[in-house]
Amino acid sequence: MNSIKSHILRSSKRYISASSKRLAEVEVTVDGRKVSIEAGSSIIQAAELAGVTIPRYCYHDKLAIAGNCRMCLVDVERMPKLIASCAMPVQNGMVVHTDSERIKKAREGVTEMLLENHPLDCPVCDQGGECDLQEQSQRYGSDRGRFHEVVGKRAVENKAIGPLVKTSMNRCIHCTRCVRFMNDVAGAPEFGTAGRGNDMQIGTYIERNINSEMSGNIIDLCPVGALTSKPYAFRARPWELKRTETIDVLDAVGSNIRVDTRGIEVMRVLPRLNDDVNEEWISDKTRFACDGLKTQRLTTPLIRNGDKFETATWDEALSTIAAAYSKINPQNGELKAIAGALVDAESLVSLKDLVNKLGSENVTTDVKQSVNAHGFDIRSNYIFNSTIDGIEDADQILLVGTNPRFEAAVLNTRIRKVWLRSNLEISSVGQDFNSTFDVTNLGEDAKALESALQGSVGEKLGQAKKPLIIVGSGVAESKDSEAIYKLVGEFASKHENFNSGEWNGVNLLHREASRVAALDLGFNTLVEDSTKAKFIYLLGADEITNKDIPKDAFVVYQGHHGDLGASFADVILPGSAYTEKSGTYVNTEGRVQATRAATNPPGVAREDWKIIRALSEYLNAKLPYDDIYSVRLRLGEIAPHLVRHDVIEPVSQEIAKIGFNDLVNKNKSATIFEEPLKNPIDNFYFTDVISRSSPTMAKCISTFGAKIEKVKDEKPDINF
């Protein structure tokens, strides 16, 4: 069985593998416009470079070529027949015509054949208004049909594939985009074709749910209305929606998204193209958890009265906090601020400045991590240095204490992409997981990592041109965090290929959107655990427990959802979610990006930094900024790169080398406890207050279960 899998695996690599990049360019003429393009490119790519749009259904520049819709036919001089432009590589001197009468007739024929069996569902189809078939039919379709089959049009039973994707298979035109995406990109080969010709159907063959955290992308890829969003079904038309370009903050990748709203309600979330970050994909949590923005929201200030909360005005709530602070009069570290996963940089710096102005340095995040293991003095020690896009250049990868499929689903597709297209070898140390690529597990603890780096894996990493070590954020939560960072630092400092020119092969994969900005701003001041906090300020902090909150402490919770953190509070202040404010975030690779307000916050909720600024006056510690621009100037004072958006601040080779040595020196006294590393996320669909409040994510839990794990003794499941 294993040999069969290995044979199929090798075959799939040969099938998917792309030829190496050619520097040579050829000159092509498209509709009279001469363009130079890389040899090996297709005619349709040359046409796009020339500014000519060729209609297509099956072609997608992020998927393998299929060439089965024939809509992209073009006329090439000295060729007897029309050519499918998506599948034909360019040749030097080629002359292409894309809009002749001959081509128009061919496209009209293709359109007529597609519409032959297509139902007239446009009035009730969710794809209406943004449907490729609808648009091309207006240009190439006829006002009447010639189909007179006695038995009527083809009828196909709809497939039940889960709570996220709604199927209307009568509309399917067999472009196979969904099949190629699920097999090649998502790594979940559950979609395929059965039958031939008019009898061909697309589905799962044996009826089952699509179990992938990237399945929603087939909705965007479908050029007709065969696959649509089940939670969004029949809720709105595209021309009714206001579109806002922003970013996702439900993980640390920072996927570029578009938020569509109607009134104050977020109707849907779609991906935006950014080849450096998420290409054209987003995870199902990013796409479908937006209904959590409507439930369990905090809309007005609340003050605890016994076992109940009572509504209050802003003045009453802030006055109550000021009175409690004055009564407690916390000294030094007795005032503590804890920030959560979704907090923007402006709010972090505002809270830090307020706490510092009140005489305390006790600021931290809500995930118990040993920051001292990697520190926050040298930035290259806590970001993803190779960059997300740089993963495609890697030729050897070692994963340490991470499951990228859950922690960064979009980044995981990059690893699979390069694994399919090359002879990339991937090893892991830590808890085993159901990967979408072939990975060799070397053990579960720091001792296994030590052995791996001293053995054949270490030898391969040392000989690789661009090696990659990815350390998961969960490592900092283990007893062996210091020992692991010491081992990684020692190994990297001994091998020049880990720090050569623009390449730094040591990477930390975060899972929280606020984490890198918090480290950049120093929002992790180390205060002795013996210091008992008497006044605690929770800023969107919901990953805390009873042990983190002393019984006699006064607690203020500021956030946008009534989750765990709010249950500890004496006073609750309603803040804004990421779709309701303009905020700065830094993703795991150190790229600074910003959210934009797509709608207004509900009730009397306000932006977080404004709440903190107002509170500072009540506490007689007025902060020196009155608008968002002043706050961002303050960000620039502390960390200048935080005001330069969509760029990654480069770390010099010399600084990176100092960083490796710092990992060793900082942890030189570390001992190995041999505690097994655990993946920090075992429930992909419930990782933050928004997803935990989402009815759609709850349905996913009900359908798929909390975990997508395999049996320990089973051979790793290879998807190809």
Swiss-Prot record:
The keyword Flavoprotein does not apply. PROSITE patterns: 2FE2S_FER_2, 4FE4S_HC3, 4FE4S_MOW_BIS_MGD, COMPLEX1_75K_1, COMPLEX1_75K_2, COMPLEX1_75K_3. It holds the Pfam family NADH-G_4Fe-4S_3. Core subunit of the mitochondrial membrane respiratory chain NADH dehydrogenase (Complex I) which catalyzes electron transfer from NADH through the respiratory chain, using ubiquinone as an electron acceptor. Essential for catalysing the entry and efficient transfer of electrons within complex I. Plays a key role in the assembly and stability of complex I and participates in the association of complex I with ubiquinol-cytochrome reductase complex (Complex III) to form supercomplexes. One of its GO terms (biological process) is ATP synthesis coupled electron transport. Coiled coil: none annotated. It is found in: Mitochondrion. CDD domains: fer2, MopB_Res-Cmplx1_Nad11. It catalyses: a ubiquinone + NADH + 5 H(+)(in) = a ubiquinol + NAD(+) + 4 H(+)(out). It is an enzyme of class 7 (translocase). SUPFAM superfamilies: 2Fe-2S ferredoxin-like (SSF54292), 4Fe-4S ferredoxins (SSF54862), Formate dehydrogenase/DMSO reductase, domains 1-3 (SSF53706). Core subunit of respiratory chain NADH dehydrogenase (Complex I) which is composed of 45 different subunits. This is the largest subunit of complex I and it is a component of the iron-sulfur (IP) fragment of the enzyme. Residues 24-102 form the 2Fe-2S ferredoxin-type domain. Its cofactor is [2Fe-2S] cluster; [4Fe-4S] cluster. Its EC number is 7.1.1.2. Disruption phenotype: Leads to sensitivity to both cell-wall damaging agents calcofluor white and Congo red, as well as to thermosensitivity. Also increases the sensitivity to oxidative stress agents H(2)O(2) and menadione. Impairs the yeast to hypha transition. Causes significantly less damage to host oral epithelial cells. Disulfide bonds: none annotated. Induction: Expression is repressed in the presence of nitric oxide. This is NADH-ubiquinone oxidoreductase 78 kDa subunit, mitochondrial. Keywords: 4Fe-4S, Electron transport, Iron, Iron-sulfur, Metal-binding, Mitochondrion, NAD, Oxidoreductase, Respiratory chain, Transit peptide, Translocase, Transport, Ubiquinone, Virulence.
